[in-house]
């Protein structure tokens, strides 16, 4: 890394409606002289920072002024991370919404088949038929809600700044 560069390693996740992260990514945000340059994958972070080398970077080379400068960028780092995770959210929605709709349609179709079965086998027993239809409705409503809550994500990412790597003069 060059002097004046700061590489923020970020962990970001986007949960479903049950608070389980469905998008969970680590990435880097590269700044040069206080300006955002680009987002990097973790593989690019490892290469850029030389983390695979035997030499430990930045050992006792960071000044208080550098720490203050890196801290002053945290608001922008969070904004950049939110922007990226919002893009990932939109990609997920575009990919999953048709799948979710198809899954719900299959459940509705299966629910109708169950109702038809009970209507043909219990047509003489009105009370039992109504009871079975209520049971089928509740079962399918519960399962449909579970599918929706499991596959639907919230655009409310959890962002954690894991580390800041800085380029220094040797």
Which role does the model predict for each range below?
Residues 1-170:
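Charged, non-catalytic accessory extensions
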